[in-house]
Amino acid sequence: MLISSKNLLLTAREGGFAIPHFNFWDEMSAHAHVAAAEKKNVPILLAWAQKHEADIDIDEALILGKFYGAHAKVPIVLHLDHGFSPDLVKYGI
């Protein structure tokens, strides 16, 4: 299930736990991170970084992240604003 980072961070603060953050760079890595989160029954930040742009652009990352996040059995935050280009960071937000 996709949720907002604000909601997850508030829940983590109240529950006293940290949230793992994993970068994905293709479909297999996105799937693996979500599958591991489900196996451990923990929420995660599923993130794309601009350094992976040669392998997967931000629009493809959005499609993959939304798909795997929407089908996940645990809370997933899709995080697409890790970059060095201000325009890309704004687009990712």
Question: Where are the regions a protein language model picked out?
Answer:
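N-terminal active-site wall of soluble small-molecule enzyme domains
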Residues: 7, 52-93
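Hydrophobic faces of well-ordered beta-strands that scaffold small-molecule active sites
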Residues: 18-23, 44-48, 76-82
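Conserved active-site and cofactor/substrate-binding residues in soluble primary-metabolism enzymes
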Residues: 3, 24-28, 56, 60
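Short, solvent-exposed amphipathic alpha-helical segments in soluble enzyme
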Residues: 35-40, 62
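N-terminal amphipathic alpha-helix/helix-capping segment at the start of soluble metabolic enzymes
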Residues: 1-20
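Generic structural signal for hydrophobic
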Residues: 12, 33, 37, 91-92
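N-terminal glycine-rich phosphate/pyrophosphate-binding loops that anchor nucleotide-derived ligands
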Residues: 21-35
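Short, well-structured secondary-structure segments
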Residues: 38, 42-53
